Regions:
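Class I S-adenosyl-L-methionine-dependent methyltransferase catalytic core
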Residues: 1-152
Length: 152
């Protein structure tokens, strides 16, 4: 019997209600709706025309939520190819390919100088079983990835 698809959804904005489907994975814990709602309520006025980086995209829920609420561009990093494919399916379905880039790579090993861009908002929600917060913050700082008023 095939494994059932798990789902999450975009909770507000232009793409509210859009389902994000993915194969269940014991190492994946999508951001819960309540957590997303709280985060995006704080950011409400800070998303319009912003460039965002999702360093550990997983299902893409945070970056896609940002797009739904007015972000100009999102770059997603995800090291699992299947999850990148799932994000790309949603990006295509929403018709926002021109606003997104999905990179199948480990963000903590990527040469960010190749991107030659700064971000207004960086989502940092690494796998729960790995200690990557400090390493990621160091990468953000060393590569000067934030704009002057950027947020992590």
């Amino acid at each position: 019997m095939a494994k059932k698809q798990a789902t999450s959804r975009i909770i507000a904005g232009d793409y509210k209600g859009t389902k994000l489907s993915f194969k269940p994975n014991k190492n994946l814990r999508p951001t819960e709706s309540k957590t997303k709602e709280t985060l995006f309520n704080w950011l409400l006025n800070d998303l319009h025309k912003k460039k965002c980086l999702d360093m550990f995209a997983g299902t893409g829920a945070l970056g896609l939520e940002a797009l739904s609420r007015g972000a100009e561009e999102v770059i997603f990093f995800e090291k699992q190819k299947a999850l990148c494919g799932a994000i790309e399916v949603v990006v295509k379905k929403l018709g926002v390919k021109n606003k997104c880039r999905v990179i199948n790579a480990n963000s903590t090993a990527f040469d960010f100088k190749k991107l030659n861009t700064k971000f207004d908002l960086i989502f940092l929600d690494p796998p729960f079983n790995e200690s990557l917060i400090q390493k990621s913050l160091n990468i953000i700082s060393e590569n000067e990835l934030l704009t002057d008023k950027g947020l992590v």
